[in-house]
């Protein structure tokens, strides 16, 4: 695909970059820990995944439909304000914005944690780790001050790189799959309904970010067409990666060991391919964190800009640079993070 076909007009992102924003923001650090949490329930967790995917699919369809009807930046905030008024819109914008920049701090810390595999000096040194995490936040803030296209390129590259370990385990990992790890199907001692409900709740937070492409809609080429396609494609890619890779890990590692694993994907890779594969997973996890950080930092500037344009946030948040970047919201949120 040519550069022009993906970007449309200058300064906007196309289908692939919008899709990478969805996939990249969804697949942060959490997916690399989720198999251990689900191992407490056993193979029945696959049903929790399926119910959660079904619910996320309906939610994605709602966002896709709304993005065709309301072509303005802001995503969930804009849709809430349009449907329920200024007060509801403000509450959604305020709560969502806080969740973004506070979550960014956690993502940065998690990314530094994975980097410690390669840089032992980060282990047991909270001050150094904090400084590196702060540095990561400001590095991606700097990237986000350049242009939406540059942010999109970084997002696309990090997304492609970080899904490689998930694809490897979600495909080749099944060559080492032991079906006995799924017997009995329910390890929790609870009823099947309770186990499925619990695993669905655990899986649900892995789908945070499916709405990402709707927020910078005025920076998306032909948004009424691109955003629905990117949202559905991004959700589908992430869901397939989640289910395949998680089931593979559960089939590789004995349930009793998996429940206590601090790095289930790395442990599974080590069992299958050796120590070098564990390092590959750690690198993928670090890139996953920093790729998600890049995408969420983009949104931390776009959301308050949309609210400021409609006089629900201070007008200064609507100011943009020559590149069309809402620099005040971007910088202020990074300071808070």
Role assignments for model-derived ranges:
Residues 23, 27, 47, 51-55, ...:
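Lipid-exposed faces of alpha-helical membrane segments in multi-pass integral membrane proteins
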Residues 3-10, 45-46, 122-129, 156-283:
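Helix-loop-helix junctions that connect adjacent transmembrane segments
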Residues 21, 32, 60-63, 89-93, ...:
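Alpha-helical transmembrane segments and their lipid-water interface positions
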């Amino acid at each position: 695909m040519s550069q022009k076909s993906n970007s449309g007009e200058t300064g906007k992102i196309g289908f692939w970059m919008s899709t990478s924003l969805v996939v990249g923001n969804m697949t942060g650090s959490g997916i690399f820990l989720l198999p251990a949490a689900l191992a407490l329930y056993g193979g029945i967790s696959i049903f929790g995944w399926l119910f959660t995917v079904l619910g996320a699919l309906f939610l994605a369809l709602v966002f896709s439909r709304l993005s065709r009807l309301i072509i303005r930046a802001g995503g969930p905030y804009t849709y809430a304000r349009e449907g329920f008024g200024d007060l509801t819109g403000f509450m959604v914008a305020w709560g969502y914005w806080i969740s973004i920049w506070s979550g960014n701090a956690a993502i940065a810390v998690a990314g530094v944690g994975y980097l410690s595999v390669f840089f032992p000096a980060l282990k047991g040194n909270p001050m150094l780790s904090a400084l590196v995490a702060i540095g990561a936040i400001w590095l991606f803030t700097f990237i986000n001050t350049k242009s939406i296209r540059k942010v999109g390129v970084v997002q696309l590259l990090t997304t492609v790189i970080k899904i490689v370990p998930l694809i490897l385990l979600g495909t080749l990992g099944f060559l080492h799959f032991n079906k006995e790890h799924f017997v009995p199907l329910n390890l929790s001692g609870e009823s099947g309904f309770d186990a499925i409900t619990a695993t669905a709740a655990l899986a649900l937070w892995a789908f945070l970010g499916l709405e990402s492409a709707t927020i910078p809609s005025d920076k998306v080429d032909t948004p009424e067409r691109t955003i629905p396609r990117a949202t559905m494609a991004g959700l589908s890619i992430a869901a397939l990666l989640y289910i395949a890779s998680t089931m593979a890990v559960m089939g590789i590692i004995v349930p009793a060991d998996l429940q206590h694993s601090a790095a289930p994907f790395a442990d599974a890779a080590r069992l299958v391919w050796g120590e070098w594969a564990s390092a590959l997973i750690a690198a993928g996890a670090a890139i996953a964190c920093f790729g998600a950080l890049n995408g969420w930092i983009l949104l931390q500037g776009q959301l308050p800009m949309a609210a400021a344009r409609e006089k629900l946030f201070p007008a200064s948040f609507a100011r943009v640079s020559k590149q069309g970047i809402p620099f005040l919201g971007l910088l202020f949120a990074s300071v808070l993070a």
